[in-house]
Amino acid sequence: MWLLPALLLLCLSGCLSLKGPGSVTGTAGDSLTVWCQYESMYKGYNKYWCRGQYDTSCESIVETKGEEKVERNGRVSIRDHPEALAFTVTMQNLNEDDAGSYWCKIQTVWVLDSWSRDPSDLVRVYVSPAITTPRRTTHPATPPIFLVVNPGRNLSTGEVLTQNSGFRLSSPHFLLVVLLKLPLLLSMLGAVFWVNRPQWAPPGR
């Protein structure tokens, strides 16, 4: 009858001596840092980060070497902070395959069996898709049209129209103006010739 209380006490002691965030969420392409808090009695022990459904069979990814320096394995690094009674795990360049169950663990025994286990705490990692922003297409502004006139020179109508880059002599608007003005010009020329015609006096006067 003493076996069940002993196992329960062992489990509770391991769970209470180490505490992680429970769950964390990162974005694909970014980095994610997990803090795992522990009691002062575990300052000198190695800490490690493993992945799996169960803490007794999870696969170790990276672990400390008893020193306060960063240990790295691929995109995952770990560092112990004894002064803060915590160790941190950083996962860089996240992708959707990194989502799953992980464990903060402290190595207290070298040979694990059914009677002994390392303190551990489950951390569920979620990875959300990267946020992409649509590219904005910009169009160049239309340059303004300037009409440069020499003050010492009078430009004819044809020259003014030619210097305006927005108006062409072959455009329909120009042809329409010419067709409308041509009869008026011909009428004016006819009137001038009529007024200036020679006056012939009848013979005998």
From Swiss-Prot:
Q: List the disulfide bonds.
A: 36-104
Q: Spell out the protein name for this chain.
A: CMRF35-like molecule 2
Q: What ranges does the Extracellular topological domain annotation cover?
A: 18-173
Q: Name one GO molecular function term.
A: transmembrane signaling receptor activity
> CDD domains from the xrefs?
IgV_pIgR_like
Q: How does it sit in the membrane?
A: Single-pass type I membrane protein
Glycosylated residues, per the record, are 154
Task: Give the location in the cell.
Answer: Cell membrane
Domain named Ig-like V-type: which ranges? Answer: 18-120
